[in-house]
């Protein structure tokens, strides 16, 4: 057979690996370890798409490579299976979310196995398994005991269509929910919060120790948002009330001409005048309908209402009006700001909108035209006049502290993590609220608190989760007769994914989250591969939980993931009309190399776009595996371009990868394999071993495959193939195309064993040196010949070879040779007359 029969070979080796537990995690303590982690998927009803295997193939290549290098490799897979989609589907169809999830997992697992990934399935985890979420609940009880899990009445992002509140991070810039695109409104509710802010400084500082993309670290730094400045206290005129503002520029206090409170600020109702009460109430209602992102959009029109009250500027005693405006958030800082319109563009626009005073306190701009936001020497600032920014800040902070109306302060943009969901399909929060007003955590001996099975999973309508409908589960009685009620909120999907990488290390332990010695052996994760969309949410939450567990002495490292890599996106093919509107692929026909709209006949422009059901451009890996084979899909996705680049899917590229694998198959099965080395492939083979090794280490898989192609081209020019080079080449291609490699290994090595643990080939540096070199022959200063000669020949040998060359002899025929100048490894210059 002259081609690679993937339909026979791939299932054969997948069966072998499963039967022999080929990829069971090594436990030899004398070996180094390598922990390769994929971001585990949510098992949706749609199954895998071709974007999933890109990251999975990358970690699989590394895992297979490290096994061959003698490492114990931990390469696991599991399921992030709680969450809204399964529950929404169950509500829409009447099906059990547990059954739906189990079916989806089975389908995902089938698809993953068909791609030949070397996962240790003995370590599979599922966040919906009570044996797993027992430990999610255990972590929560520890957070509760340490005061890091607490209840608070907070304004939440309420999504009526989902019947639940969502975290700030789950609200899109347009004010809709990330899940479903539903409207989000602000609503005060009793919620569980996790005090991630207690770890803000450590989460910020420890980023410097991580081998992560700088863009991801910057996103986390910005989300944590450390600011150094001062808290300043403003008294409310004619009352005993006061409020605090945080400012990074206390030196501009003399330019503060009004203050702004968040509409939800606790002082608003108390200080609002009778005349302004109706306007303030209306504005507060309108603000409650907007998300935080919509409220803080810099481009939106400035709105606000005066409360009728005045604050006293502590530095000059001036009375300045107190406004409310929705761009100030109660959840950020103190919920109050001092406005310096001369030097802040948003304040300037607000002042212009409502005809408020603008007082310049930094020289250098024309504050009537726009806010001057650069630095300058202070003016109109009494004892700060003439000072620069740094000196003025130091002086005003000292003054505020001396007068008792302010102090230096460090704040963070980071808010505590909203941890409750009013849904059924999530981990029950293990807390009981007693009728005597106390609350206690469910004892560890009673964990897991199992999610009760019910068909009635619709939201309760009261703002509580459907668990509030389940009286038998809900109501409990203490030994002393005191009645209690279980917490009805469930945990968000982020809970189970915040620590799953730890459970892989010891997935069947019934006594503890994981064994201490095993955690010491495997942590930190050596490489974590997944999408950049998880930069803030999952990665920040996982770091927080890990640091908390470090403080408890559960884990031995400060950070969970030493190296992070974000793969790019695989884009689909799409088509645009003359307006730029996207056209679904089933509305497109190809004629003479161009693309046309089936209905209108308009010629369309082909362009890459994110794969989506609506555009009908989603590529199913099952179809690719059926037609081309799993190895082709793996090689193609790694050869498309750099791993972190976003690149359009190409059927032609897929076919090219398949042709390459067929050439590999023919090379090994058709060439005569020799026990003796004739030296013809010494250089290219050793170059290939070196290049592929180095490029796998640096995740440059596309250039590694390109080098494998170079070797195949060179080897095909030879009649025979040295057996050690054939074996070495098969080992080099094995991480990329493991099924093909296993099959070819049997034909060459004839051991009957898997190639998986055969030692990785090495290269001989001496063979990388060129044996031959090109020299030029000049006659009368003009190049007349180029000759390949052995390296480092003497002058005499070079001269002899040059004069014997037929071209040279023809040029000097009948002429007298005056002089021959030979420069070893460079040229021969012949002077004639």
From Swiss-Prot:
Gene3D superfamilies: HUPs (3.40.50.620), Isoleucyl-tRNA Synthetase, Domain 1 (1.10.730.10), Valyl/Leucyl/Isoleucyl-tRNA synthetase, editing domain (3.90.740.10)
Subcellular compartments: Cytoplasm
EC numbers for this chain: 6.1.1.4
Motif ('HIGH' region): 41-52
Keywords of the record: Aminoacyl-tRNA synthetase, ATP-binding, Cytoplasm, Ligase, Nucleotide-binding, Protein biosynthesis
GO biological process: leucyl-tRNA aminoacylation
GO cellular component entries: cytosol
Extent of motif 'KMSKS' region: 610-614
Keyword Ligase: yes
One Pfam family from the record: tRNA-synt_1_2
Catalytic activity: tRNA(Leu) + L-leucine + ATP = L-leucyl-tRNA(Leu) + AMP + diphosphate
Keyword Kinase part of the UniProt annotation: no
Ligand binding (ATP): 613
Superkingdom per UniProt: Bacteria
Molecular function GO labels: aminoacyl-tRNA deacylase activity; ATP binding; leucine-tRNA ligase activity
Cited PANTHER family: LEUCINE--TRNA LIGASE, MITOCHONDRIAL (PTHR43740:SF2), LEUCYL-TRNA SYNTHETASE (PTHR43740)
Family: Belongs to the class-I aminoacyl-tRNA synthetase family.
Protein name according to UniProt: Leucine--tRNA ligase
